[in-house]
C-alpha cells in the first residue's frame, strides 16, 4: 500500500480531524509503521456503537501499517469511582472490554492498566486509597 492509500484510509470517516494532512504524509515517509495509542476509561458497559466506530477506525490504522495499542484504564476507573469504585466489578467489565476489542480489532495490542502493575497490585491499591483522601 502506498502512502496516499494509507493516508486516505486513516482520513476516511468517521475521522473528523487530522492535525495536518501534510504531517501525516511526512510521518509515513519517515516511518512505515508508526505507533498509535488510544486510552479508554472503563466507565460502564461498552456501547456497541462506540466499539464499532472505534474498532473500525483502529482497523483502518492497522491496515495502513500502524501499530495500534488500546489501553484500558481500569485503575483510572477506580480512581474516578466509576462502577461504584468496586474493583471486582471493574475487573469484570474490563475483561468484557478486552474481549470485545480483541474480537473487533484482532491485530491491535489490548492492554489493561492492571497488567502493567501486576507485580505491585497491593502497593497501587493502597496508594490509590491514600490519594483519594488527600487534597492539595
Regions found by a protein language model. Give the residues of each.
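Structured alpha-helical segments in the cores of large, soluble enzyme domains
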Residues: 24, 58-66, 93-98
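Core alpha/beta catalytic barrel or barrel-like domain that forms the active/cofactor pocket
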Residues: 37, 69-75, 112-113
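Active-site-proximal loop/turn and secondary-structure-junction residues that shape catalytic pockets
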Residues: 42, 74-77, 116
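Histidine-anchored nucleotide/phosphate-binding helix
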Residues: 48-70
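Glycine-rich loop at the start of a catalytic domain that most often binds anionic cofactors/ligands
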Residues: 52-55, 82-87
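Short connector loops at secondary-structure junctions
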Residues: 72-85
Amino acid at each position: 500500500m502506498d502512502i496516499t492509500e494509507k493516508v486516505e484510509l486513516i482520513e476516511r470517516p468517521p475521522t473528523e480531524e487530522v492535525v495536518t494532512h501534510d504531517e501525516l504524509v511526512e510521518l509515513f515517509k519517515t516511518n512505515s509503521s508508526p505507533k498509535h495509542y488510544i486510552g479508554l476509561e472503563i466507565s460502564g458497559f461498552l456501547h456497541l456503537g462506540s466499539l464499532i466506530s472505534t474498532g473500525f477506525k483502529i482497523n483502518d490504522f492497522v491496515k495502513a501499517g500502524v501499530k495500534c495499542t488500546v489501553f484500558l484504564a481500569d485503575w483510572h476507573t477506580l480512581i474516578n469511582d466509576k462502577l461504584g469504585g468496586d474493583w471486582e466489578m471493574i475487573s469484570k467489565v474490563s475483561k468484557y472490554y478486552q474481549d470485545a476489542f480483541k474480537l473487533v480489532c484482532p491485530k491491535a495490542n489490548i492492554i489493561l492498566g492492571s497488567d502493567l502493575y501486576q507485580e505491585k497490585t497491593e502497593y497501587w491499591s493502597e496508594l490509590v486509597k491514600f490519594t483519594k483522601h488527600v487534597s492539595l
